[in-house]
């Protein structure tokens, strides 16, 4: 996963847990594609201060993911749902008659995992 995409995804899940300043810097840098210098000028701080704040925010987001794993769970669930769609497509076309039963099994596993949360 590219770093840019990874941080945006982590921010979607855990961004509200960051400080307001970290949230603002992440949004400006990753969301609005401003440079460190542009953010520094806007907040009347040094580029180094912006860089340090971004790195701390990125590390905090990564730590949340390591502990909670919500992005990982979402990604795995998405892959499973794509597999279900493919199996059902095969079932409908007659190419994979076992697709319906396999799909049910995958969906049951997803539900079981959600109930464990």
Curated annotation (Swiss-Prot):
SUPFAM superfamilies: Sigma3 and sigma4 domains of RNA polymerase sigma factors. Might take part in the signal recognition particle (SRP) pathway. This is inferred from the conservation of its genetic proximity to ftsY/ffh. May be a regulatory protein. Belongs to the UPF0122 family. This is UPF0122 protein Dred_2057.
């Amino acid at each position: 996963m590219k770093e840019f995409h990874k941080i945006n995804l982590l921010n979607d899940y855990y961004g509200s847990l960051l400080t307001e300043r970290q949230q603002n810097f992440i949004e400006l840098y990753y969301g609005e594609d401003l440079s460190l210098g542009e953010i520094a000028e806007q907040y009347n701080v040094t580029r180094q201060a912006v860089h340090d704040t971004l790195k701390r925010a990125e590390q905090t987001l990564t730590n949340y993911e390591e502990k909670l794993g919500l992005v990982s769970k979402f990604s795995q669930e998405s892959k499973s749902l794509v597999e279900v769609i493919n199996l059902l497509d095969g079932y409908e076309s007659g190419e994979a008659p076992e697709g319906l039963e396999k799909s049910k099994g995958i969906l049951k596993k997803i539900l079981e995992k959600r109930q464990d949360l």
